[in-house]
Amino acid sequence: MPTLDRNGQVSLQDSRRPRTLTRRRVIGGLAGGLLAGAVLALPVSPPPEQLDRAKVKPMNFNAFSDAAPSQPLRLLFIHHSCGGQWLATPGPDDGENCIYRTAVNGGGLRDALTGAGYSVHEASYGSRLGAATDVPDWPEKFRRQMDDVLRCDRQDTPYSDSGCNDIVVFKSCFTQSLFVAADAPSGNGGGWRLTVANAKDAYRELLPEFRKRPETLFVAVTAPPIARSVEPLYKAVAKRLLRRGDVTASGPLAREFNNWLTDAKNGWLADYDATNVAVFDLYDLLTDNGESNFSKYPTGRRGEDSHPNAAGNRRATAAFVPFLNQAVRRAGLCN
């Protein structure tokens, strides 16, 4: 409604000012919200890595031939998705329960092992023997299910003859590289908190079970490394607020644990005098042998997926087969 100013002139400003100010506030609020959203969506690069260049000395199998074994050997691989893709022939994803005939990221390990004279068998999702492959699960699995593991043909189906597996390969998934702390030993057989100390406890518990089966070679494959990708700021903030696992901090802890597994002098097998246990360091291989504490072969559009890509799986196959050929001779399974 028109009003008179102090000079008696008609003024329209008073009646319009509240509406104009409200509109400006709304527009300003929307702009601020859009700006804040854009900032939170900005990618945040992880800080530079602080790498420990100290190298451990793994077990040396060079005294043994890496040629194919002189007799057929049965091999069981207990795995989930990464192991299934590693075994698979390259091609479209074709399989179920992570037992693939072909896979986009296939590493061709099954074909390579078969060509070297191994009979390859698998247990994965959808089976009692293939379930529960986290680090703390292994002691209970081998303690309670060892006979079934050794007789496993595929999933929970045993061999129809009286034979057993000569080799048992077991591997946890990359989630078991997401360590939360170093921590002190818990004394509870590993527990469910993934610390370096608890993981060491779990693997120490395996050795008495393996010692009871000197005729079987047990191959521990280290878990693949975590992908260290760029993530939006809002995810980084949310993880901090929710106290979720810190991927950056987990890398050095995963390196510490896997170095311990493979260190022949001071590690897991330093005091184990039998020859029926070996460690294949897939973690180190997929970090380009210590060039990072994280995966150098990730998948996903931005490298955010920790499943190894085809190049990483093929590289692992090229290293694993001669390693296994030497390990079976060291274990006395063939000449």
Residue ranges of predicted features:
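A solvent-exposed, charged loop/short amphipathic helix patch at secondary-structure junctions
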Residues: D93-T102, S177-N198, P232-A249, P298-R302
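Catalytic His-Asp segment of secreted/periplasmic serine-dependent ester chemistry enzymes
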Residues: A227-N335
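Active-site-proximal beta-strand/loop segments in catalytic clefts of secreted hydrolases
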Residues: I78-S81, A123-R128, F170-T175, V221-I226, ...
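Loop/turn elements at helix/coil->beta-strand transitions in domains of secreted/extracellular proteins
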Residues: Q71-L75, G115-H121, G163-V169, K212-V219, ...
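Hydrophobic membrane-insertion alpha-helices, especially the h-region
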Residues: G28-P43
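N-terminal module-boundary/linker segments of secreted carbohydrate-active enzymes
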Residues: L42-G115, S119, N325-N335
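N-terminal export leaders
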Residues: R23-I27
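Conserved SGNH/GDSL esterase-like catalytic core that processes O-acyl groups on lipids
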Residues: G84-R193
